Amino acid sequence: MKFALVTGASSGIGKEMAYLLAEEKYDLILVARREKLLNEIRDDIVHKYGVDVHVLSIDVSLGYKDIYDYCINRKIVVDILINNAGFGYYGKCLEADEKVYELMIDLNNKALTGLCQLFGKDMVKRHEGHILNVASVAGFMPGPYMSVYYASKAFVLNYTLGLRQELKGEGVKVSA
């Protein structure tokens, strides 16, 4: 039984990735803040694909260590880590509340890096696994009114490229 962990799984790319992985018969750990939506997705996936689905209603930016502990305590081996949770803010950079940017960086960068660090070490020990960090075309260029988001996605791209090079030959695939 192979497990995939998907953050930001309650909608959008994360939700679609969960369905694609379930179709491939991966058991799932779905993580997002919106528990009701996660439970609905879980029920639908279990009904359609018959796989095991765990739901964690956690703010990834605050609880990425709790996600790891949940898996360790249940002896769940994560074969695929999909770091999809993230958000952006639209507005003039200097007029935004700095707390918004702090939260964005905590989620888009700090939590992503933390999850890679925790699960990546286990994958290296097993000489297998796949880390997918969801980036954006915004990471390739700067832009007005979302400058911190653009910068956070540039971080994701560059961090992922560096991690891929470090883990080359370790049996762990890393992509963005």
Tell me the role of every PLM-derived stretch.
Residues 143-147:
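Active-site loop immediately N-terminal to the catalytic Tyr-X3-Lys motif
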Residues 136:
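Residue(s) in the substrate-gating loop at a strand-loop-helix junction
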Residues 92-105:
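Substrate-binding pocket helix/loop in short-chain dehydrogenase/reductase
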Residues 116, 152:
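Active-site helix of classical SDR
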Residues 10-12:
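Conserved glycine-rich cofactor-binding loop
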Residues 24-40:
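Conserved glycine-rich Rossmann-like NAD(P)H-binding loop of the short-chain dehydrogenase/reductase
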Residues 84-89:
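Conserved NAD(P)H cofactor-binding loop of Rossmann-fold oxidoreductase domains
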